[in-house]
């Protein structure tokens, strides 16, 4: 099967064949494509960008685009069109990316560089207030006393969109697994809006476009509340979402009851997909029509998982493309 055949509206011409990596539909969903980079491609990239530590990417933001260019050149110019077309394609919009040979925590800096290169072939990653950088690294362990579900291992992190409590355009989310030990469970959970059984009913409800207040706990280091609706549309009138159950603050009974019903519908959807992500692999999804979450872990005293996220905007003038925000 040619994974390209699902993309209806191209924003750039697609290559006849990928070079330096392969593409295939994932086992979990035909909407989620798997990109696997050959070891030779990965090794060549690591060597080519060795002169720049991650700190250089933090200080000089243009270098993030330069290392993206290097990765695309190693793939003979075939990578950027695939990433852009996929992230903007409503029928897909999601990728599980695996760079062969980057699979140990000792290679964490190279993992950050590789993910940064991919992200900056489609756009730019936003400032993350939690870390003070364009990315955030954090650890999940067996016990947790933080102020959100992000690091709590023994419960499901419900489906949500990122960027709900900041005034930043958040078109994409990238989630990398850097390390894990003594892990059982904890798969990524994904739901595409067009697969959600009750999407139309909630999208048509009067509450869908009501402006609501969104706040963040202290750990997010965001002081100001933001106001926006749960639903919006793209230019073709299709639903997009900006939603997270933890940070929305209903003003009254009616809003609270509707939000609770929305949450129960999302969590009860039979169309959720559970995706295992290996160390060094990462998900790159369109944040406006994919929701993501995390399944619970099996308790273990030595449990440890280190993750990195980037989230940002797509920087490409696709005709009729609207961010829905």
Curated annotation (Swiss-Prot):
Its cofactor is Fe(2+). Keywords: Dioxygenase, Iron, Metal-binding, Oxidoreductase. It holds the Pfam family CsiD. Fe cation binds at residues 160, 162, 292. It is an enzyme of class 1 (oxidoreductase). It catalyses: glutarate + 2-oxoglutarate + O2 = (S)-2-hydroxyglutarate + succinate + CO2. It comes from the Bacteria. GO terms for molecular function: ferrous iron binding; glutarate dioxygenase activity; oxidoreductase activity, acting on paired donors, with incorporation or reduction of molecular oxygen, with 2-oxoglutarate as one donor, and the other dehydrogenated. Pathway: Amino-acid degradation. Binds 1 Fe(2+) ion per subunit. Its EC number is 1.14.11.64. The keyword Metal-binding applies. The keyword Oxidoreductase applies. GO terms for biological process: L-lysine catabolic process. Homotetramer. Belongs to the glutarate hydroxylase family. Acts as an alpha-ketoglutarate-dependent dioxygenase catalyzing hydroxylation of glutarate (GA) to L-2-hydroxyglutarate (L2HG). Functions in a L-lysine degradation pathway that proceeds via cadaverine, glutarate and L-2-hydroxyglutarate. This is Glutarate 2-hydroxylase.
């Amino acid at each position: 099967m040619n994974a390209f055949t699902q993309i209806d509206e191209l924003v750039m011409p697609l290559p006849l064949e990928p070079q330096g990596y392969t593409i295939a539909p994932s086992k979990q969903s035909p909407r989620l494509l798997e990109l696997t980079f050959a070891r030779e491609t990965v090794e060549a990239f690591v060597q080519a960008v060795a002169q720049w530590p991650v700190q250089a990417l933090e200080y000089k933001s243009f270098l993030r685009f330069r290392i993206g260019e290097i990765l695309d050149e190693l793939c003979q110019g075939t990578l950027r069109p695939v990433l852009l077309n996929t992230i903007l394609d409503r029928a897909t919009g999601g990728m599980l990316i695996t760079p062969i040979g980057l699979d140990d925590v000792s290679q964490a800096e190279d993992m950050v560089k590789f993910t940064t290169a991919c992200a900056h072939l489609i756009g730019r990653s936003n400032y993350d207030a939690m870390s003070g950088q364009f990315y955030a690294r954090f650890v999940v362990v067996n016990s947790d006393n933080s102020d959100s579900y992000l690091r709590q291992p023994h419960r499901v992190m419900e489906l949500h969109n990122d960027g709900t409590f900041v005034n930043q355009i958040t078109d994409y989310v990238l989630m990398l697994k850097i390390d894990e030990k003594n892990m059982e469970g904890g798969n990524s959970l994904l739901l595409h809006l067009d697969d959600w059984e009750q999407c139309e009913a909630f999208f048509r409800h009067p509450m869908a476009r009501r402006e609501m207040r969104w706040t963040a706990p202290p750990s997010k280091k965001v002081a100001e509340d933001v106001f926006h609706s749960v639903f919006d549309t793209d230019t073709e009138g299709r639903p997009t979402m900006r939603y997270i159950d933890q940070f929305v603050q209903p003003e009254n009974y009616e809003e609270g009851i509707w939000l609770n019903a929305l949450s129960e519908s999302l969590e009860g959807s039979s169309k959720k997909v559970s995706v295992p992500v290996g160390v060094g692999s990462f998900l790159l999804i369109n944040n406006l029509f994919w929701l993501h979450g995390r399944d619970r872990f099996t308790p273990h005293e030595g449990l440890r998982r280190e993750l990195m996220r980037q989230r940002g905007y797509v920087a490409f003038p696709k005709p009729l493309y609207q961010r829905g925000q």
